[in-house]
């Protein structure tokens, strides 16, 4: 489950009561709201949607080996919404409210899966400072340390506190692979240490150095690795689409200062890294790592719970073998969201299972390379992928992208197979391929 983007201000009348209450009291306050329907398209997750998703996840998979959340726990524009709704919107009151929100989310996850390790990554909205402004060694990391350490539980490795407090990085070893969580928010082209100092160490370079140490240790121990992070590499195709001009407006997800050494590092350890997992773009998608000279890795991208960009809310289950290989995955969607918000109960259903939908044996580099060829060359496969991308939402392409929707499918498809900017430009600006 990714990109929860939980909005406790969805009913602004409740904010002052929430501010003065303990997080364990929040469910009763939310239940007092007149609005008990799940968040609509164009809005972040409210309590009704979060509660429904957690309940359905538990029904679908009662005893998972672990639960992975690739970031963005907090709603978009969190500070602006808080200031508009709260009587006291001082910096101290805001920090306390954000802290309580993180505590509340952790409490709901723990109550739903009391015997399961819960493994979170941080997203770009998870900060006191603002979007893409997490302060290294700052108060948000300090305040969330006990929350996240409790979620990770006994899997927390030696050095967990130090690594989290520094940059929000950590690693754990589960049944099968070692899981490494580098904070790729620091790699983002949008990142700015707005609450820090010019004298602070570069968090992106520090995270790359830490990741290299972790991968080297895994290789020595002959461990297979899953990487889990929020922002995937490659092209920021949503921004690229909205800018319109081609090829000058192609926007990368990461600064090249970090992207190039990351690519070199993951290529060097490609025999150790089984897969990477990301979120951020809210879509059900994937990325192939490499380029025209060959691929060496892949990144399944988990769709969002939040329907703010017009996708159907979703979560995903993954099955793996003892070595960390991915056998299959199933995406679950909140279907008929339009009807649900008009009073009918929300209906969760399995949208598709990878091996059944694509007739591919498992999720690995060979299968995803073949899938990319299928959606490039076969119109029927491309149409199916086009449906799955926004989790079968009937409104995403027309409502969210407007005129850019005409180029949207090509932009997304080129991003799946072309991570490097020149290659993406040739694909997108040249009409595909």
Q: Model segments located where?
A:
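Metal-dependent phosphoesterase/phosphodiesterase active-site architecture
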Residues: 1-69, 140-221, 283-433
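Active-site neighborhood of phospho(di)ester-bond hydrolases with catalytic His/Asp-centered motifs
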Residues: 1-2, 65-72, 114-123, 227-230, ...
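Active-site environment of divalent metal-dependent phosphoester hydrolases
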Residues: 7-10, 75-78, 120-131, 188-190, ...
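Core catalytic region of metal-dependent phosphoesterases/phosphodiesterases
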Residues: 23-28, 32-135
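A structural motif corresponding to the C-terminal end of an alpha-helix
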Residues: 57-61, 104-117, 154, 217-221, ...
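Catalytic cores of eukaryotic secretory-pathway lumenal/extracellular enzymes that build
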Residues: 73-76, 88-91, 95, 172-174, ...
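Acidic, His- and aromatic-enriched active-site or binding-groove loops in soluble protein domains
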Residues: 91-110, 139-162, 251-262
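Active-site-proximal segments of metal-dependent phosphoesterases and phosphodiesterases across multiple
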Residues: 189-208, 218-273
């Amino acid at each position: 489950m990714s990109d929860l983007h939980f909005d406790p201000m969805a009913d602004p009348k409740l904010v002052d009561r929430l501010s003065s209450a303990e997080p364990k009291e929040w469910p009763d306050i939310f239940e007092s709201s007149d609005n008990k329907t799940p968040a609509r398209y164009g809005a972040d997750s409210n309590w009704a949607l979060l509660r429904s998703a957690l309940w359905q996840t538990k029904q679908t998979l009662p005893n998972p080996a672990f639960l992975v959340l690739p970031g963005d726990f907090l709603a978009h524009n969190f500070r602006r919404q808080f200031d508009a709704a709260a009587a006291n919107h001082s910096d101290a009151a805001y920090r306390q409210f954000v802290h309580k929100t993180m505590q509340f989310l952790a409490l709901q996850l723990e109550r739903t899966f009391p015997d399961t390790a819960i493994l979170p990554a941080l997203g770009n909205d998870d900060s006191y400072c603002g979007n893409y402004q997490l302060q290294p060694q700052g108060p948000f990391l300090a305040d969330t340390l006990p929350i996240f350490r409790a979620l990770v539980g006994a899997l927390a490795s030696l050095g967990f506190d130090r690594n989290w407090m520094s940059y929000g990085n950590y690693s754990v070893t589960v049944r099968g692979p070692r899981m490494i969580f580098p904070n790729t928010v620091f790699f983002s082209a949008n990142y700015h240490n707005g609450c820090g100092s010019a004298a602070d160490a570069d968090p992106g370079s520090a995270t790359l150095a830490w990741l290299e140490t972790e991968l080297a240790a895994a290789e020595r121990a002959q461990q297979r690795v899953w990487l889990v992070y929020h922002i995937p590499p490659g092209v920021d195709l949503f921004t690229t689409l909205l800018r319109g001009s081609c090829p000058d407006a192609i926007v990368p997800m990461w600064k090249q200062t970090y992207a190039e050494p990351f690519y070199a590092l993951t290529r060097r350890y490609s025999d150790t890294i089984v897969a990477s997992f990301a979120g951020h773009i809210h879509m059900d998608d994937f990325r192939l790592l490499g380029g025209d000279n060959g691929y060496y890795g892949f990144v399944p991208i988990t769709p969002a719970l939040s329907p703010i960009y017009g996708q159907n809310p979703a979560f995903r289950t993954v099955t793996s073998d003892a070595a960390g290989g991915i056998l299959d995955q199933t995406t679950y969607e909140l279907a008929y969201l339009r009807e649900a918000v008009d009073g009918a109960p929300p209906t969760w259903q399995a949208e598709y299972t990878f091996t059944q939908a694509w007739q591919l044996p498992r999720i690995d580099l060979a299968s995803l390379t073949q899938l990319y060829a299928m959606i490039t060359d076969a119109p029927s496969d491309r149409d199916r992928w086009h449906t799955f991308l926004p989790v079968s939402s009937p409104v995403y392409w027309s409502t969210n992208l407007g005129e850019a929707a005409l180029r949207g499918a090509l932009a997304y498809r080129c991003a799946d197979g072309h991570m490097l900017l020149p290659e993406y430009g040739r694909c997108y600006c040249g009409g595909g391929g």
